[in-house]
Amino acid sequence: MHSKVVHTIYKVLHEAGHPTLRFNFRGVGQSAGSYSGWDGEVEDVAAAAAYARERTGSGPLWLAGFSFGSWVGSIWALRDGRVERFIGLGMPVSTNIDGRTFDYLDRPPAPMLIVQGSRDQYGSREAILALAERLRAKGPVEVRFVEGADHFFTGHLTQLADALRGGLGLGAA
């Protein structure tokens, strides 16, 4: 929740007038509980979405996730079906976490924007482009690379914000 990447997407969406909610998964930061092997983390996304809905009403639900959050968020979005826009940042598609890969993603969970550092250690340009190509057969997917950025967009947060604004139609290209 306190990562610079999460703060950047929060700021971009908040400045555009979108209600926003940031949260930590169980056992992260001051959140109670401990890592539960995915199912609990997917439940955390569901609980956060329900909380946001209670507070904001029935407007469009956009879901953004960074790194592990993009993975878990996309699982929940596929199951739930109410997400109107999915934003994946620093998607770790070149990584195997607990024996899992992004192979489960057989369609975009919603119209999808992927923003990735061109030098991301956990999701190479080639792997991201292959994922996007596979998903485009079943729905809209846009990919934007932040040139020179690593997984954490170190030194490239302004370019990350610009890529988000451009990809979401909020200004800047």
Locate each region found by the language model.
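Serine-hydrolase catalytic machinery in alpha/beta-hydrolase-like enzymes
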Residues: 1-58
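Gly/Ala-rich beta-loop-alpha elbow adjacent to hydrolase catalytic centers
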Residues: 65-73
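Acidic catalytic loop of the alpha/beta-hydrolase fold
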Residues: 95, 118-123, 151-152
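A conserved short beta-strand
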Residues: 82-94
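Short beta-strand immediately N-terminal to the catalytic nucleophile in serine-hydrolase-like folds
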Residues: 60-65, 89
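Catalytic histidine neighborhood in serine/cysteine hydrolases
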Residues: 133-152
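Catalytic histidine-centered segment of alpha/beta-hydrolase-like enzymes
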Residues: 33, 149-161
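Short beta-strand/loop motif that positions the catalytic acidic residue
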Residues: 107-109, 113-116, 120
